[in-house]
Regions:
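Bilobed "Venus flytrap"/periplasmic-binding protein-like clamshell domains
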Residues: 23-51, 55-56, 111-178, 288, ...
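Extracytoplasmic small-molecule ligand-binding "clamshell" domains
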Residues: 36-72, 78, 235-236
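An extracytoplasmic/periplasmic, membrane-proximal ligand-sensing/linker region
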Residues: 40, 167, 171-173, 177-178, ...
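Ligand-binding clefts/hinges and TM-proximal coupling segments of bilobed small-molecule sensing domains
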Residues: 133-150, 221-293
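C-terminal motif of bacterial Sec signal peptides marking the signal peptidase cleavage site
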Residues: 16-19
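Acidic, polar ligand-binding/catalytic clefts
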Residues: 73-110, 121
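Positively charged n-region of N-terminal signal peptides that target proteins for export
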Residues: 1-5
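Pocket-lining segment of extracytoplasmic ligand-binding domains
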Residues: 83-85, 93-95, 122, 159-248
């Protein structure tokens, strides 16, 4: 009888400890380990863990679409997402067949570049040249998958016109290095580690001209963007492409005080983030062209610093 009692007490203690650990852990939804969401999520977790009474844990995911589903279903608490994908998820439009809500914005962080990599000696010089080629369009539930489909369509192509693969950045870069892939799409801050690691062997394809104009007009969220020369080894010229804003979001169930503290720590430590290296990150950038309401905790911080944002 005593043995059974001890086992029960031990089991209850473990359950209580596990529950406490879960309750006091904030899950951060990021992306591929060789993408910028994961890198910046790791930086964010390190800063917050040094300035908080809870533990912030980085979670690898497929990317924006997955993060929006996960935060809506309460599997993660804060997440990095593309603004264009976020807007579609929030409103149940685009590639989303229903609304995914339960989250609000903390801050717009930086502009991600839509990058299309091909082998350096390839005869592919335009998106139009991808017809019949093996192309990674991005992982399922990633933001890049939505971008790649839209861009192919703008050039008169679709998934059935290419040998479509759905790989992570890491796996796509590995496949290209091994000669098993003709091209891959990557939407991420630059430089992106997955591309940096093979930069001597690849070139980037531009998205420019009338097609870029049409895409920015058709889809709210795209902006014209330049990948500056020498961003990657061997890249001697600017590459004109499109960009989308990265937004950090928080679950609506997270307390106002917690989100206010997160927001404050981001701005107090902005010099420690890789995404702030080009000096474009400030309160104006963080709050402009964010297409969903802000969390009340973030709003409180902005208001105290003279910036008003919508919360509903």
């Amino acid at each position: 009888m005593k043995k059974v009692l001890y086992i029960l007490i031990a089991a209850i203690s473990i359950m209580a400890f596990s529950g406490c650990g879960m309750k006091n852990t904030v899950q951060i939804g990021t992306g591929d380990v060789n993408g910028t969401y994961y890198a910046y999520g790791t930086e964010l977790a390190e800063i917050l863990n040094n300035n908080s009474d809870v533990y912030f844990k980085v979670r690898k995911t497929a990317g924006s679409a997955a993060n929006l589903r996960l935060i809506s279903q309460e599997y993660v608490d804060i997440a990095f997402v593309q603004s264009d994908v976020m807007k579609d998820a929030y409103n149940g439009t685009g590639y989303f067949d229903k609304e995914y809500k339960g989250y609000s914005a903390i801050a717009g962080l930086y502009t991600e570049a839509i990058q299309v990599a091909v082998p350096k000696d390839s005869d592919i010089n335009s998106i139009s040249d991808l017809y019949g080629k093996s192309v990674s369009l991005g992982e399922k539930e990633s933001g890049v998958l939505q971008n790649s489909k839209q861009i192919l369509s703008a050039y008169g192509l679709n998934e059935s016109m290419v040998d479509a693969k759905y790989l992570s950045y890491t796996d796509a870069a590995k496949a290209m290095k091994n000669g098993n892939l003709d091209a891959f799409f990557c939407t991420a801050g630059t430089p992106t580690r997955a591309i940096t690691e093979i930069s001597d062997d690849i070139k980037l394809i531009p998205i420019d001209g009338t097609v870029a104009n049409r895409l920015t007009e058709q889809y709210n969220g795209y902006v014209k963007h330049t990948i500056k020369a020498n961003t990657y080894d061997g890249q001697t010229e600017d590459i004109e492409t499109l960009g989308v804003k990265t937004v950090l979001i928080a679950s609506d169930k997270m307390s106002d005080d917690r989100v206010k503290s997160i927001t404050k720590n981001i701005f107090d430590n902005s010099n420690k983030f890789g995404f702030a290296k080009d000096d474009t990150f400030d309160m104006n950038f963080a709050t402009e062209n964010v297409t969903i309401p802000f969390h009340k905790g973030a709003s409180e911080y902005y208001a105290e610093n003279g910036v008003n944002v919508e919360t509903e």
